[in-house]
């Protein structure tokens, strides 16, 4: 759905052949938008700007959207949208469950690779960003009608499992007695033994061979470790209120059977060649080759990632693949996509994108660490935030802080600041939603004293917006009209901070409206119209928060 500003700009460009570059007016008396297109054209045409502006206005056919354009100053064109048009468009948001989000003309199958914790280790701060960002993409693209296929590429394979399983066997431990934190401690203990005892290290390597060969006892312990880990991961996903489930898990081990075929195809196509005993793919413009099979015959992460692309295109029928990982992996994905296209695993009509994110920093501006210098577990991070606010508010603070800046930027985790209900924070948006809800609930109780105080506000009949005489009303309605277009931009560019900025502006516009335009104290048609405007605002705020994965409370 094109917003009113976009429709207006398109109509003007169609009339004059130039993008008018509409900008929000600096003051209400100048209308809603200004354009300096006449000043730009005047330089080219060597004519007075006001004369050029007059010619432009004469060509415009926008009476169905705007009041008569005005020429101001040296040649600015001021435009004011018609109040009845604003009212009609904003009224649609009162009852539309999707709040104006248009369904994609050509729905796609979109694979999103995110979260990806490692088995036998607790999720840490780095997984926070991948999980929250990927979940936001999942919600936004699903809202547009795309089929989203989450892929949780957990680290469930590798030589480290030989070390851990051998330690468990030799210590005669019953691994079922441990939770994820206990298993992580076992991993750390096994690593110390591996580093200190060469004989244990040899036995651990032989255990890897047993794992790869399908030894029953080794596989039983390995599968138990995965089950314990998934239980821990799911507990964290539940705390984070994200959409990932066990059905989305596609661990490294799931590609094991595909790896020989992938390498054979690369060799057959002349892409993989032997170099110092390893099989490598040399890519033009890259300093180092991609190693798809190591000297010892083992397959590395690159081969697994190629197999994943091959399956996601071939079996999952992906039209678009999105990877959400640390920005420091950008080069890896650049090479991966190049090789996948060279091999034909990634056709030209399938889009592949890596969305990199920055680090989480402590209040001191340094990478977030424990006092001992270790990695902070995600559960400890959530516990820290919940010492400052209730769980749903703390989570809103964390998610909004994560999503509201450009993703590649590092951000400072300052729980005390993030949970504030003032300023550019998640709790501020929650408070705005609760405040709108409170007004509507009071209005419903005044109309019917017997109304259920817990009744669904969205299910009530709030009528339509019919009166927009005040600038604050018009500005709020204008912002509402942009919501669908903002979501479209976020879905295309994968820029959730733009949705955060929009929602913050919307909450601010509602605050101005609340101060300048009494709702419950107004009467007649004005009161009904303002209540409908409140209902539309509540719906858009709630839908927008949901796309960010943030709870929209009716009370705070």
Swiss-Prot record:
It catalyses: tRNA(Arg) + L-arginine + ATP = L-arginyl-tRNA(Arg) + AMP + diphosphate. Pfam families: Arg_tRNA_synt_N, DALR_1, tRNA-synt_1d. PROSITE patterns: AA_TRNA_LIGASE_I. GO terms for molecular function: arginine-tRNA ligase activity; ATP binding. It is found in: Cytoplasm. One of its GO terms (cellular component) is cytoplasm. GO terms for biological process: arginyl-tRNA aminoacylation. Keywords: Aminoacyl-tRNA synthetase, ATP-binding, Cytoplasm, Ligase, Nucleotide-binding, Protein biosynthesis. Its EC number is 6.1.1.19. InterPro entries: aa-tRNA-synth_I_CS, Arg-tRNA-ligase, Arg-tRNA-synth_N, Arg-tRNA-synth_N_sf, ArgRS_core, DALR_anticod-bd, Rossmann-like_a/b/a_fold, tRNAsynth_Ia_anticodon-bd. It comes from the Bacteria. A motif ('HIGH' region) lies at residues 117-127. HAMAP family: Arg_tRNA_synth. Belongs to the class-I aminoacyl-tRNA synthetase family. PANTHER family: ARGININE--TRNA LIGASE, CYTOPLASMIC, ARGINYL-TRNA SYNTHETASE. Monomer. This is Arginine--tRNA ligase.
